Every structure is written in C-alpha cells, then in structure tokens.
Amino acid sequence: MTPPASPSPGIRFENIDKRYGGLYALRQVSLEISAGECVALAGRNGSGKTTLLRIAARLVRPSAGSLTFPSTHQSGEPGRLQSGFVAHATMVYDELTAEENLTLFARLQGTTDVQTRVDTLLRDVGLSDRRSSLVRTFSRGMRQRVAIARALLQEPSVLLLDEPATGLDPHGASWLAGTLRRLCDAGCTILMSVHGESEISSLATRGIRLDTGRVVADTKAGASLQSILTFADA
C-alpha cells in the first residue's frame, strides 16, 4: 500500500453546529484529531457520526464553527487538503468496470499518470484479475474494495470512512482491517464511524462517542475505549 504523499495533518473541529431546519444534527462539537491517529466514532444511528464525517470531507458546511487542519496550516476550504472519503453506501458506478471506475475518478481528480496509479491500486486492493468485470457483478466486499481504491487515488493524508465494515463477510472484513492497519502504519490519519466492537474498530487507538449530536465520551484508555466500542449502539 502506497504511504501518504506528505505528512498527515491533524483535524480540528471547533464549536461545530449543524442544523437542518430546526433540528440539530451536531451541537458544539470541539475535537482535535492528531496527525496519524486512528479514531473510531461510535454512537446510535442518528447520533451525528455521518454528519461529522461529511463535514470533515467538506461535502457539507457546518451551520456554525470551523474546521481546520492545523499541522499544515490549512483551512477547511475545498481542494486544499488531500483527503479520501468512503461513504456508507459505496459510491461506485455499477455499469462500469472496476478499472473504468478508477480511471474516471482519477481523470476527474487530475491524477497524474492515470494508468500507473490505477494499475497500482487494483493490485493493492486485490482486484487486478477482475479489472474488466462490471461492478454490478461484485459482492459488497468487492464493491468496498473499489470504493477504497477510489478514495486512495490522490494518496490522501486523511481517510474518512462511514461504517466501512457494514455488509462485509469475514474475509472482506479481515482484508479491510489489514488495509487500514497498513495505512495507519504509514502515517495516514483515519477517522471512521463504527457499529460495535469488530476487527475494524479494534484498530482504533482512540474512541469518541456521540449522542444526539454531542460528544459524550472521548478516550484513549484501554478499558474505557473498549467500552465505547462495545456499547456503540446501546
């Protein structure tokens, strides 16, 4: 797996609010994710995990507060930080092949030496022999591999994942855990939402629990961290 192209920046959320009409999805969220940390977001459905990830990915704007990347002195403006986002619903095109999906997004993102990068990623995610297969014929786990390869096209310093293990069989979950472990070892900053304790969540060195849009727990300690992950949906 190719390591990040540059030292991975941390992420700082300062007093983040997100409203949809009169409903708060996030309220007064202040967090700092250190460079190279692997952080798990836990909580019930609707607790704000996906909204926080989408703000970090700059797909939505907060209603109040700020998002910054302090270790590189970059603001949260689009295009100023290489980050990859893997959504809960895999964002790939069913009627294209695995190779065509990656080639399309590589060109849209301005990737240099597109064919070499696509070849490398197909090999890294174990899909070289299925490069010419239509994605609609893939299992959930194989689709997830395409989505992760897409997120890694720009060699991101930050990887954001929304429930990446959902629907994966044990083999797919084991592959994903190994991939994320290699990225962590290479210095990539990872922020991911999880449901309960799993091989994926066990990679986390820090756990943050959200409830009704607020941070209610944040720990790196062993027993406390496992408690957050084990009872993520309680």
State where each predicted segment sits:
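The feature captures the beta-strand-to-loop junction immediately N-terminal to the Walker
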Residues: 42-44
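Helix-to-loop junction immediately C-terminal to a conserved catalytic motif
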Residues: 57
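Conserved catalytic motifs of ABC-family nucleotide-binding domains
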Residues: 155
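Catalytic Walker B motif of ABC-type/P-loop ATPase nucleotide-binding domains
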Residues: 159-162
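H-loop/switch region of ABC-family ATPase nucleotide-binding domains
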Residues: 193-195
